[in-house]
Design a protein with these regions (language model features):
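Proteins enriched for Cys/Gly/acidic motifs involved in redox and nucleic-acid/cofactor modification
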Residues: 2-167
């Protein structure tokens, strides 16, 4: 499973290089699954290139529906018709924010809380608005609910996360 970044072209080139190396492993072990997710997969030109040049990839999904990972994996493993084709599930609708997803924390005393996604700045050097979508914020009630749950669980340090948390 490759969670990709597309902020720099070199990151894309590394992914293509790894996919090329994986082709021989896939020939030796056809049951091996190769899955790609993340910002790089939000670019249609990238997905098109992978579909034509890297047929050893089994599943592609984007940043907006990462929560569907288990569902897509189960489809590939258990659905006989899906085993013969590449599954591509990239959401272009960036307005939807899926709430109440399970969170795994690394530390018991601190946590991050996403308060917004995307960006409206469209800086000449940055691809974020194109792959993560326009700026959108979570509902304040949902943010507060999540923070209260974290505090009740013993978290004492909470970092608000987002591309532009001051917007």
């Amino acid at each position: 499973l490759y969670n990709t970044c597309t902020v720099r072209e070199n990151a894309n080139l590394k992914v293509y290089g790894h996919l090329g190396q994986l082709k021989r492993y896939k020939k030796k072990n056809p049951e091996m699954l190769t899955m790609l997710c993340g910002c790089m997969m939000q670019e249609q030109t990238v997905v098109d290139k992978i579909k034509t040049s890297y047929r050893n990839v089994d599943i592609i999904f984007g940043t907006h529906n990462i929560f569907k990972f288990a569902e897509l994996l189960a489809m590939r493993v258990f659905d006989t018709s899906a085993k013969k084709r590449m599954i591509v599930d990239v959401w272009k609708d960036t307005d939807a924010i899926v709430e109440e997803l399970p969170i795994e924390r690394k530390y018991s005393f601190k946590s991050g809380v996403n308060i917004m996604f995307g960006c409206n700045n469209f800086c000449s050097y940055c691809i974020v608005p194109y792959v993560r979508g326009r700026e959108r914020s979570r509902e304040p009630e949902e943010i507060i609910r999540e923070i209260r749950e974290l505090v009740a669980d013993g978290v004492v340090e909470i970092m608000l996360l987002g591309q532009n948390v001051n917007s």
